[in-house]
UniProtKB/Swiss-Prot annotation:
Family stated for the protein in its record: To yeast YNL018c.
GO annotation terms (biological process): sexual sporulation resulting in formation of a cellular spore
Compositional bias per record (Low complexity), positions renumbered to this chain: 197-214
UniProt-recorded name of the protein: Uncharacterized protein YNL034W
Top-level taxon of origin: Eukaryota
Region (Disordered) residue spans: 171-217
Listed Polar residues bias regions: 177-196
Length: 612
């Protein structure tokens, strides 16, 4: 047996696949020395015996003994792939088109001896699965038929994906890798660069100067973009998704070398999901999703999902999806919101319903995005009565910015009246008077801003504060505090309302790097907390970046790592870890340390830092 074949068999045993090799020749016909002539003659004899009658002889075939051997295995694979059970023995169901009863009769059983060697990352399983030569001679005639059937069924029913690591590729001979490039499994998940992510509002909003352009609701990605019809659901009730990072192994038009990336062999002997894909979709709680996709895996509202990602992505809830899929007649489906009232099947609408509030929020988000992406927009408005009547037919007004609408909503907080509320008739969009549509959407944005201010108890909001607050999918806490949009968002920074002027420079100077700002903040803390003494050396001014600390306009507390609410003695004695070669800074600050002993603890934390 050649060295390449032994390495390939050891690789297959390592990844957990049981391969039983049916040797058609006696053990004496294959010399152990591995001579080129003897091995080539044996390979030619085996190839002529197992080649079907309908397949012509390839004259230009390579005479390399190793490539000839693997060419024989490719054309008539004498391999039976079994799923490994938890009990240790091979399952009776083969991964082929032959039934389990017929496979058990044609293939002799072999004693399996397993030696499990556990490492940090993988488990190596060594099997001795070669049957005796006498049993092989008895089943030689039946193995010929079984091997030919397996050659056409293994590629169809077995989902074997090879690993993409360099170690696993080195175990495979080049001839087998080239053969596998042409026959890959079409059921692997696609993770190419052109993946469709969750539909965001940025992609659905047009960048034209008209704010009353029709808003297309975000639909789910097309089913053809995901293999086997598996696509991520946009329902907010879905709480978890399975991420499988695999390259696209489907055949492409370009002449690229496509190599499968993983070996995926589920260890399950009771569920036969590959024969019943419908049962598999019912039992799987989490549907697979493509790579590079931001999906919230925790039970929460769409607001938490938007705030955690610092984006304007809005998940369509279930009730809104039903509202978008409501039955419409032919006129409504063709004309949309411009359909006249007498042609509509539904002529009334509840402006206080969750469906309309969601649509109003979408209009506000669209207005905000258009305000950010374009210059101050002008629209034709001949109904402006503040100008002389002879100028009105040629009048173009400037649309108010989102900041101006925010200021107007805050100024009229206690005297504001909703423009659209209650159960009323539907007001369709006008085709011949577009300025009325623009004014209607401006009023809807004001209604949404005032609704967010009213729910948030008139907290300080800015341009994105009321957009990230979702009052439709979750119950709003009456004591909720809306956090303003920070220009310096980061996962390791927690903003608190504790006044500390030393760390205000981290917020007011976003141009510098994180390590420089944290360095300067620690220097300022050391200046204010530790008095000058003779036993403590002064720091070198040339070793640290010099940053000016401006006067703080608003108190803000920056905590890098917060362990718990109650500061114990173990937490207060944490050491400061700071290395100049790395950009990671780990600082532990207690929530409410007592004033007694604060100076001594700060001196203990920053002693090494001050000596530098």
């Amino acid at each position: 047996m050649s060295t390449s074949f032994q390495e390939f068999k050891a690789f297959c045993n390592k990844v957990g696949l049981d391969f039983q090799w049916l040797n058609l020749q006696s053990s004496k016909s294959v010399p152990e020395s591995g001579s080129s002539e003897g091995f080539s003659a044996v390979s030619d004899t085996v190839q002529e015996n197992i080649r079907p009658a309908t397949e012509p002889l390839n004259v230009n075939q390579s005479k390399d003994p190793v490539s000839n051997f693997f060419y024989d295995v490719k054309n008539a694979p004498l391999w039976n792939v079994y799923k490994r059970n938890h009990s240790g023995h091979s399952s009776t169901e083969a991964c082929s088109g032959v039934s389990s009863g017929q496979a058990s009769k044609n293939i002799p059983e072999a004693m399996v001896k397993e030696t499990v060697l556990s490492n940090h990352d993988n488990v190596t399983i060594i099997n001795e699965l070669l049957p005796t030569s006498s049993a092989m001679h008895q089943e030689e005639s039946t193995a010929m038929t079984t091997s030919y059937l397996l050659s056409h069924s293994v590629n169809d029913s077995c989902n074997v994906m090879l690993s993409s690591s360099s170690h696993n590729r080195a175990m495979l001979p080049p001839s087998l890798v080239q053969r596998n490039n042409a026959t890959t499994s079409p059921t692997t998940d696609s993770a190419s660069e052109n993946n469709e992510s969750v539909p965001s509002l940025t992609s659905s909003v047009s960048t034209s100067s008209s704010v009353y352009s029709s808003w297309n609701p975000p639909h789910s990605p097309h089913i053809s973009s995901f293999p086997d019809g598996n696509f991520a659901s946009l329902n907010a009730e879905v709480t978890c998704f399975d991420f499988r990072r695999t390259k696209d192994s489907r055949t492409k038009e370009t002449n690229e070398s496509i190599i499968p990336t993983e070996i995926y062999c589920p260890i399950n002997s009771t569920d036969h999901h590959k024969h019943y894909p419908s049962q598999k979709s019912k039992q799987d709680a989490c549907a697979p999703a493509p790579r590079n996709q931001n999906i919230s895996c925790s039970v929460g509202s769409a607001a938490e999902f938007s705030q955690s990602n610092h984006t304007l992505t809005t998940v369509v809830p279930s009730y809104m999806q039903q509202y978008l899929d409501r039955p419409q007649n032919w006129f409504e489906s063709k004309m949309g919101k411009y359909c006249p009232l007498f042609l509509r099947s539904t002529k009334n609408i509840d402006y206080d319903s969750l469906e309309f509030k969601f649509e109003r929020k979408m209009i506000a988000v669209q207005y905000l995005l258009l305000d950010e992406q374009s210059e101050p927009r002008r629209y034709y408005n001949p109904s402006n009565k503040s100008i002389p009547f002879w100028k009105r037919p040629f009048n173009f007004d400037t649309m108010p910015s989102y900041d101006q609408l925010m200021e107007e909503a805050e100024c009229r907080f206690y005297s504001y009246q909703y423009k659209y509320e209650g159960f009323q008739r539907i007001e369709p969009y006008s085709i011949f008077c577009p300025w009325k549509n623009t004014q209607r959407e401006i009023d809807l944005v004001l209604d949404h801003i005032h609704f967010s201010l009213d729910v948030g108890e008139k907290k300080s909001l800015n341009r994105k504060g009321n957009i990230t607050l979702d009052t439709l999918d979750s119950k709003v806490d009456p004591n909720i505090q809306i956090k303003p949009y920070q220009i310096f968002p980061s996962n390791n920074l927690v903003y608190e309302g504790l006044p500390h002027p030393a760390e205000q420079s981290l917020i007011l100077s976003p141009g510098t790097s994180l390590i420089e700002r944290a360095f300067q903040a620690l220097i300022d803390i050391c200046k204010e907390s530790i008095p000058p003494s003779n036993d403590c050396t002064t720091r070198n001014h040339n070793s640290a970046p010099q940053l000016t600390v401006p006067e703080p306009s608003k108190p803000c507390r920056l905590l890098l790592v917060r362990e718990s609410r109650t500061a114990t003695e173990l937490e207060t004695n944490k050491k400061l870890w700071l290395h100049s070669q790395r950009r990671n800074i780990e600082v532990t600050v207690p929530m409410h340390p007592s004033e007694h002993g604060t100076k001594s603890r700060l001196r203990k934390w920053l002693s090494t830092f001050v000596h530098q």
